[in-house]
Amino acid sequence: MALRLAERLSLEEDSVGGGNLVFSPLSIYSALTVVTAGARGTTLAELLAALGAPSSRDALAEDAGEIVRALPGGSGTATGGPRVAHACGLWHDRRRNVKPAFRDAAAASFQATTRAVDFLANPEEARNEINSWVAAATENLIDTILPPGSVSTDTRLVVASAIYFNATWQTPFRKQDTKKDKFHILGGGGDVDADFMRSGDDQYVAAYDGFKVLKMPYNTRASRTHTQPQYSLCVFLPDKRNGLWTLADRMEAGGGEVFLREHMPEKRVKVGEFRIPRFKLSFDGSIKTALQGVGVRAVFDPAAADLSDVLEEGNSGDPPLFVSDVLHGAAIEVNEEGTEVAAATVVIMKGRARRPSPAPAPVDFVADHPFAFFVVEESSGAVLFAGHVVDPTNPSQL
């Protein structure tokens, strides 16, 4: 789902003059998995297909829960390991309770908490409460996921998923080695002066026909049973300056996350020239159109959505549920020490409303033109964050 969504979100960015992109496939995956627990019929089938899931929602919930439970918590950066925090919450109108089976499924998979609020009388108060929850879960990197007007008296349920990641490199860069250099913008858009991190250390680099891949491992806590770095930032760099979209199409055709895993570098090699820019990106907006583009349609249609397993029956005049919007926020900063990144996804429901050839030694890796990046958990292959850098000097936000 990560690459398919990236393509759709990129199309939307281009239409508004954007370029850079960061989002969290895992956060979106978690929120949509919660929704599947209350879906039936075509609504459920479309969600399962988009998530690349098994044929049953129970199997999906089990798989998703295993990924989330594998994320280490706590203040890992204090002990040299990553700090990873994932949180999930449900807010329902106090006049209609969440069905026990739906609540229990969300709690079992994601330790989701459920809260009753008064959407009818105090929608703004409910919005502020949810925003405060997201801000706390993301260490204030995302302080407002729900803009004014996004929660109304028609709102019946809000599902939120947030993730925070902070880790240091296994081999940090020296700040004194960071220097300005030219970064070439897509489509002949000229050059910009960007801050490039540099290193003469051996790196995890693999060279393929038309592109190279860099893996930069993060520090992990010492363990008798797990000695290899668990998290890494992977950079897919096309050989051609304007080759980002061609590479993205090739990755998607190759199976998305499968392509990513098959092309992950396995060993360090000597490098010649090595440069990668520092970057700081953010995203904030609706991903409804992007989700519709990957086949999730019925859940947004007031006449077709079947979310009958979400809420208890209300008054006879209460209309059926549908999803009015899915909002997503993400922010990432990559620098000499490591990476800090966070994301949140909010679902608002309303009533009707392959192995590489050995890389030559030494090999150059100069990321001076647009590239794709992924923060991955290596044992499961889970993609926590994904995106691409078109201009590292522009902290673009949708």
From Swiss-Prot:
Gene3D superfamilies xrefs: 6.20.40.10, Alpha-1-antitrypsin, domain 1, Antithrombin, subunit I, domain 2, Serpins superfamily
Single Gene Ontology MF annotation: serine-type endopeptidase inhibitor activity
Keywords: Protease inhibitor, Serine protease inhibitor
UniProt keyword Acyltransferase present: no
Region called RCL, residue ranges: 338-362
Site features described as Reactive bond, chain residue numbers: R352, A353
Domain notes: The reactive center loop (RCL) extends out from the body of the protein and directs binding to the target protease. The protease cleaves the serpin at the reactive site within the RCL, establishing a covalent linkage between the carboxyl group of the serpin reactive site and the serine hydroxyl of the protease. The resulting inactive serpin-protease complex is highly stable.
Known role: Probable serine protease inhibitor.
Stated name of the protein: Serpin-Z6B
Organism, scientific name: Oryza sativa subsp. japonica
